[in-house]
């Protein structure tokens, strides 16, 4: 059993390394720039993609951004100068596509993280981060369904947060002061 654990750790880490290295660094830099210009940031996704998106919204809040997970009852109206981030491996998740269309109609900048090079959601987006986690652009994963996609997006979000924290000169103490103290 311990050998099996080691094999899976090596497999998962190798897959994530291949997938993250295939993401265009220029697109990540443009994503970072869009966030720096944003008045507010909204994240959307369903299932595990939604959980990864919500974790990103929380970390953005720690850094000092006004950020919301779409669907939470405290989310204000989206509008111009806002950034709407859609996370969906398929790029076709109906709820997320509909939310992005509504945000676009309200004047928000749409950023999509997806495995797909084209589709309705990509067409709505000012910026698409292609997250290649399936052949032919990405690795053949031994993990179930969109597991590699979610892992890769989480790593990309963590990288962007590290960049933003540095660019905004936010210390760990400042982030910790914004962390929930109700736990």
Give names to the regions the model predicted:
Residues 1, 165-183:
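A short, charged, Gly/Pro-tolerant segment at domain boundaries
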Residues 18-25, 65, 133, 161-170:
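Generic secondary-structure signature for well-ordered alpha-helical cores
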């Amino acid at each position: 059993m311990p050998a099996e654990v080691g094999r899976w750790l090596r497999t998962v880490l190798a897959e994530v390394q291949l997938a993250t290295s295939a993401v265009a660094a220029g697109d990540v830099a443009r994503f970072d720039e869009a966030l720096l210009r944003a008045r507010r940031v909204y994240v959307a996704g369903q299932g595990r993609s939604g959980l990864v998106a919500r974790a990103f919204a929380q970390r953005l809040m720690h850094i000092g951004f006004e950020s919301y997970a779409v669907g939470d009852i405290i989310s204000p109206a989206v509008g111009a100068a806002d950034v709407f981030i859609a996370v969906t491996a398929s790029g076709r998740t109906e709820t997320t596509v509909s939310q992005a269309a509504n945000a676009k109609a309200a004047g928000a900048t749409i950023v999509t993280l997806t495995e797909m090079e084209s589709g309705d959601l990509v067409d709505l987006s000012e910026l698409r981060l292609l997250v290649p986690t399936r052949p032919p652009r990405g690795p053949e994963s031994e993990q179930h369904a969109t597991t590699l996609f979610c892992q890769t997006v989480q790593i990309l979000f963590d990288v962007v947060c590290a960049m933003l924290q540095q660019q905004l000169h936010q210390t760990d103490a400042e982030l910790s002061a914004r962390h929930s103290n109700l736990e």
